[in-house]
Amino acid sequence: MDLEFGRGMRSPQRDSWKTTLLLAYQSLGVVYGDLSISPLYVFKSTFAEDIQHSETNEEIFGVLSFVFWTLTLIPLIKYVSIVLRADDNGEGGTFALYSLICRHANVSLLPNRQIADEELSTYKLECSSERTDKSCIKVWLEKHKKLHTALLIMVLIGTCMVIGDGVLTPAISVFSAVSGLEFSLSKDHREYAVIPITCVILAFLFALQHYGTHRVGFLFAPIVLAWLICMSALGLYNIIHWNPHVYQALNPCYMFKFLKKTRKYGWMSLGGILLCMTGSEAMFADLGHFSYSAIQLAFTSLVYPALILAYMGQAAYLSKHHDFYSNSQVGFYIAVPDKVRWPVLVLAILASVVGSQAIISGTFSIINQSQSLSCFPRVKVVHTSDKIHGQIYIPEINWLLMILCIAVTVGFRDTKHMGNASGLAVITVMLVTTCLTSLVIMLCWRRPPVLALCFLLFFGSVEALYFSASLIKFLEGAWLPILLALFLMAVMLVWHYTTIKKYEFDLHNKVTLEWLLALGDKLGMVRVPGIGLVYTDLTSGVPANFSRFVTNLPAFHQVLVFVCVKSVPVPYVFPAERYLIGRVGPPGHRSYRCIVRYGYRDVHQDVDSFETELVESLATFIKLDASYRCSDASGGGGDHEPEEERGTRLAVIGSSHASYDIQDSVQHSSAASVETTTTRRRSGGGDDDGSPGGGGGRAKQVRFFIDSHVASPEAADNKQVAEELEALAAARDAGTAFILGHSHVQCKPGSSLLKRLAVDVGYNFLRRNCRGPDVALRVPPASLLEVGMVYVL
C-alpha cells in the first residue's frame, strides 16, 4: 500500500526530471499498450465498408486526415491537456470524476455519510465551502434527486462499457496481430490457423492472470517501446520510399472531400476510424500509477509521433498500390516489407498481449471500485503482489472474460465486426468522461458554466459523430457491447437498489442505546468471555439483527464492538485515518463502535491484520477517552460531544507505524500502555500491512502493560482505564467472534411486478450465487456466527 499511496499522492512538482523520465518509460507498458497497437486494425476496419480505394487517393488521404485530427483533438488536447488535470488525489478514471463531483455537491447515493468523512486528508476541496454553496449548478443538482440517479446511471454506463471493452479489446488486438500469418500461409490454411492460434494465445493470457504481472511486468515497457520504434521506422521507410508528399493529407480539407465523395458509406466508416483512439481512456484511468507529467511526456514525445508516422506510412504505401483483391486486405501487414514481416509479426503479437493485459487489469480494477460503491455483487479479490497494492485478480471475472473473448473471436471471425463492437464501447466511455469532466469544470474548478458548456459541445459533438457512426452498425457487431451493457446495468442497478433498501430497512428498525443498556436487567443477560464483532451498515444505534440475537439468546461477549465497514468518496483512506472509535453506553458496559473507512480503490484487509489493528485502536481510544473525560471534568471542555464527533476526534490507526506516533502523544496517561511488536516470519517480507501478502509475512502481537502504581490526581480514573484495558486484554486472549447478518430479502405484498422481479428474482439469485459477506470480509469460518434476518422491502 505504501507504493500505491506514494504514487497516488505524488506531487508533480516534487518529481525530478530523472523520476519523470523513468515514470514516462514505465508508462509505455501500462498506459499505452492498447493505444499503440491500434494501427494493426484501423485501416482494415475503415475500408471494410463499401468504400472503393480509387487511384485518386481521396479516400486514403481523407481517412489519414481523419485519423490525424482525431488523435490530435481527443488524446492530445482533450485528455493530455484537460482531462488529466481532473484527478482525484492523483487518481483518474470514471469513478475519480464521480468522486470529485460527490464531494463538491451532495449527489452521492452512498448511505451512512458522516461529517467526519470530510476531515480525511484525501477529502480535499478545490475551493472553500462558502464559495461552493453559492453555485447555482450545485443547488440545482442537489435539489433534484432524480439527477443523482441519472448521474450514477451515467457512471455505470461508462463502467459497463469499460468491462465490455475488456472483452473486445483482447480479441481484436490478438486477432489483428495474428492475422499477419495470412501473408505467409496458403489460402486453404488461413482459416484453420489464425482463429485457433488467437484462441490459444487468449486462453494462455487469461490463465496467467492468477500469477499476476509483477514477475513479467518489467518486460512490458521494452516491448511497447520496441513496437513504437518499429512502427516509426516502417512509417518513415514507406513515406520516403513510396510517397513523400503524403503529409498533404494532414490538411483538414481532405476530410470534407472524403465525406463528399463517399457520402453515407464514408460516414459509416467513421466507426473504424475511431479505433485509432482505443486506449486513450487508459491515460486517465492509470493516472494514479504514474504522474501527469510522465504520462504527458510519454505521449507527446514518443507515442503521438510514432502513431502519426505509422498511419502516414500505411497511407503512403496504399496511395501507390490499388490492385487489391478486396478492401479487407487494406491492413497493416500489407505495408510491411517481406524481409522483416516475421520479426514484425512476433513483435506485434507481443505488443497485442501487453495491450490486452492493460485492459484486463483495468477491468479488474473498475469492478473492484463498483463493488466498493455497492454497485456490483460481491466477488473475491485476490492480491497478486505483496508489494504493489493495486495489482488484483478476480477469479470469476477472469474466466468469464476468457470465455467471452474466445466466443467473440470464434463468432465474429473478422476485424470488421470486432471493430464495430469495440468502437461503440470505446466512444461511449469517452462520451461519459466528457459529460463528467464538464461537471468537474463547473463544480470543482469553479469555472464559468459557459466554459464547461464549450468543452461539452466541442468534444461532445466530435464524439457524438463517431458514436452515431458506430451505432448505425448495430447489426454488424455493435449489438454486442449494447447487450453486455444492458445485462451488466441490470445486475448493477438491481444490486444497488436492493442494497440501499436494505440499509433503509436497517435504519428504520434499529433500536436505541437505552434499549441495549436496559436489556441486561430484563432478560438476565450473561456476558461471555471474548470479543464480539457485530457487523452492520449503521453508523449509529444498535442494528436489528443484534437485537434479534440477544432476544433469543440472552448472552453476548465481554467486549462488544459494532463494526461498520463503509466506503467514502475518496480513492484511498490513509491507515492513520481509517478507524473511527466511539463508545456505546458508559465505560463499564464495555461496548464500542468502530467505523472502518475505505476508499473506492482500497482493498479490504485480511482478518488477522484487521483484528490486531482493531484491538490496538480500542486500547488507544480507551486512554484518549479517559484523558478527555478528565479535562472535561476539570472545566477544560465544553458541552458533551455527540458520539460521531468524538469518534472523529479520537480517530486512530491500526498500522504499527502510525501507532507509535499516537503512543507518543498520549504518554500523559500513565495508567497503561500498549506495545506493538512485529515479528517477520521470513526475510524480504512486504511492507504493506494492508495486503494479504503482507499479513502472511509477519506476525503481529499486542501486549498490555498495566501499571500497579499510579501517582496522579486522577488515580480513580486511571484505575478505571487499567481495568478496562485488562478486560480488553482478557477478551482478546479468549478469542474473537464475528457476528454477521444472513439476510433473506422479499418484497412487500402488493409490490409492482418490476420490483418483485428485481428483488425476489434478481437480487436473491445474485445473493445465492455470489460471494457472501463473510468471504468479502475474509472472516474465518471457525469464528463466524450468522444471524438470520428477514428484510421485507
UniProtKB/Swiss-Prot annotation:
Extracellular side: 44-59, 173-191, 237-264, 314-343, 413-422, 470-473
Compositional bias per record (Polar residues), positions renumbered to this chain: 664-675
One Pfam family in the UniProt entry: K_trans_C
Record-annotated membrane-spanning stretches: 23-43, 60-80, 152-172, 192-212, 216-236, 265-285, 293-313, 344-364, 392-412, 423-443, 449-469, 474-494
InterPro entries linked to this entry: K+_transporter, K_trans_C, K_trans_N
Lipid bilayer topology: Multi-pass membrane protein
Cell compartments where the protein resides: Membrane
Cytoplasmic-side segments: 1-22, 81-151, 213-215, 286-292, 365-391, 444-448, 495-793
Location of region: Disordered: 664-698
Glycosylation sites: N420
Alphabetically ordered keywords of this record: Glycoprotein, Ion transport, Membrane, Potassium, Potassium transport, Transmembrane, Transmembrane helix, Transport
Positions of disulphide bridges: none
GO cellular component, one term: membrane
One GO term (biological process): potassium ion transport
Origin: domain of life: Eukaryota
Function per UniProt: High-affinity potassium transporter.
NCBIfam families: kup
The family this protein is said to belong to: Belongs to the HAK/KUP transporter (TC 2.A.72.3) family.
Protein name: Putative potassium transporter 8
Organism ancestry: Eukaryota, Viridiplantae, Streptophyta, Embryophyta, Tracheophyta
Gene from which this protein is expressed: HAK8
